[in-house]
A protein has these predicted regions:
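Short C-terminal beta-strands that terminate individual repeats in beta-propeller domains
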Residues: 1-2, 41-47, 86-110
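Blade-level signature of beta-propeller repeat domains, shared across WD40, Kelch, NHL, RCC1
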Residues: 119-147
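Eukaryotic, compositionally biased intrinsically disordered regions
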Residues: 26, 76-78, 116-117
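Short amphipathic alpha-helices and their capping/turn residues within compact interaction modules
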Residues: 15, 38, 50, 57-60, ...
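Structural hallmark of WD40 beta-propellers
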Residues: 9, 16-22, 30-31, 40-43, ...
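Canonical WD40 repeat/beta-propeller blade segments in eukaryotic WD-repeat proteins
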Residues: 1-18, 50-57, 112-126
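WD40-repeat beta-propellers
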Residues: 30-34, 74-79, 143-147
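Structural signature of WD-repeat beta-propellers
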Residues: 24-25, 69, 137-139
Length: 147
């Protein structure tokens, strides 16, 4: 009998408390779950080429999530934007269209190392220029990335 890999991380949205972002061990797919409708992912976020290590929702942008992975990428996901929908590569089954629940990233940043962790900077008088910042750790370094 084959078992699904264990969930590795879970992040609750600060703006939509019924939404959770999660990924499994050794997975490159983030799943967005609605706790009011358990059992099926609302969205799948695909864009990483290697195992994901971290996810975090933006504290200031509703529906925005950042992720980091072993592919050395930080990806930004905008769940509210329809322009990030990916045409499913899965063929139609019995003439029915494939589900439209896959999204691609809206922005990316290449790190010099595998991304171990990340965190959104809270807004303050030090960064009130309108931009968002993400702290990224990889290898033995830490970077500040402005969006």
């Amino acid at each position: 009998m084959s078992y699904a890999p264990p969930l590795l991380r879970l992040a609750a949205s600060p703006h939509d408390t019924h939404l959770l972002a999660t990924f499994s061990q050794d997975s490159n797919i983030i799943r967005i779950l609605d706790v009011r409708q358990p059992g099926q992912a609302l969205l799948e976020l695909r864009g990483h080429a290697a195992a994901i290590n971290c996810i975090e929702w933006s504290p200031s942008r509703r529906g925005t999530l950042a992720s980091g992975a072993d592919d050395s990428l930080v990806l930004i996901w905008d769940l509210l934007s329809q322009s990030t929908a990916i045409s499913p590569s899965v063929p139609a089954v019995n003439g029915a269209p494939a589900p439209d629940n896959t999204r691609g990233p809206t922005a990316s940043w290449q790190c010099d190392y595998e991304v171990g962790n990340l965190s959104w900077a809270p807004h303050s008088s030090l960064n009130n220029d309108g931009g968002d910042w993400i702290g990224v750790s990889g290898g033995r370094g830490v970077w500040g990335v402005e969006l």
